[in-house]
């Protein structure tokens, strides 16, 4: 398209140059015949035509240059943006498979070493062991790595990931449905049955209850020695005893006189 437009512009300029030549020849002929007024008008019109043609050609070249600059800049931007957004699915799948197999091999080797070297007795209840099931083909997320416990103790169970292949408690063989990995672990685990840890209950000794005894209030009365020798079966009130003792004392005093 650009070559075709340039060819058309060249043809138009060539025709204009030929027309200007013929116009100049005609003006020279008129000048020879002493027609000065006609020559002046013709020259003025020729100057106006040339100026307008130059302005038009300049505008055309500027517009063509801007149109050419726009498509050249677009492909460079697209080429720079394409490698950033491009991701190959083959490499991601290959990396995922390699990491998945390495994680499974490390977890199985650790569990076998723990079972053979150490006689660890698990204190888990039977309900927890029945609820935990192992699946042979477990799908782990690519971004997450399972925690590795170097001390040999059993890590806590993650309730969100039921397919986690790392936590392997005592598994009965009845739960393994044709899974070779589960059957191998089941045979190893049957050699040592889990023993339940004894529960120790502390009895609280009851505190002895202390009861306060009521204090007796003693009333001291002035009595004579005769009243002291009276028997305890006397049912009279203490006031009557006091009055009788005083009367007896006065009678003795009168007899002595």
Curated annotation (Swiss-Prot):
Bias kind Polar residues: ranges: 73-90, 226-257
Q: Which GO terms are recorded in the biological process aspect for this UniProt protein?
A: symbiont entry into host cell; virion attachment to host cell
| Tree of life domain | Viruses
NAD recorded as keyword = no
Q: Which residues are glycosylated?
A: 72, 80, 85, 87, 92, 105, 127, 139, 199, 215, 233, 251, 253
- GO CC terms on record? extracellular region; host cell plasma membrane; membrane; virion membrane
> What's this protein's name?
Major surface glycoprotein G
Q: Which gene encodes it?
A: G
Where does the record place the region Binding to host heparan sulfate? Answer: 187-198
Q: For the region Disordered, what residue ranges are annotated? A: 71-93, 122-161, 197-257
Q: Which residues cross the membrane?
A: 38-66
Site positions for Cleavage? 65-66
Q: Where is the composition biased (Basic residues)?
A: 204-222
Similarity section: Belongs to the pneumoviruses glycoprotein G family.
Record-annotated disulphide pairs: 173-186, 176-182
Q: Tell me the residue ranges located in the Extracellular compartment per UniProt.
A: 67-257
Respond yes or no to whether keyword Signal is given for this record. Answer: no
Q: Tell me which parts of the chain lie in the Cytoplasmic compartment.
A: 1-37
- Supply the alphabetized keyword list: Disulfide bond, Glycoprotein, Host cell membrane, Host membrane, Host-virus interaction, Membrane, Secreted, Transmembrane, Transmembrane helix, Viral attachment to host cell, Viral immunoevasion, Virion, Virus entry into host cell
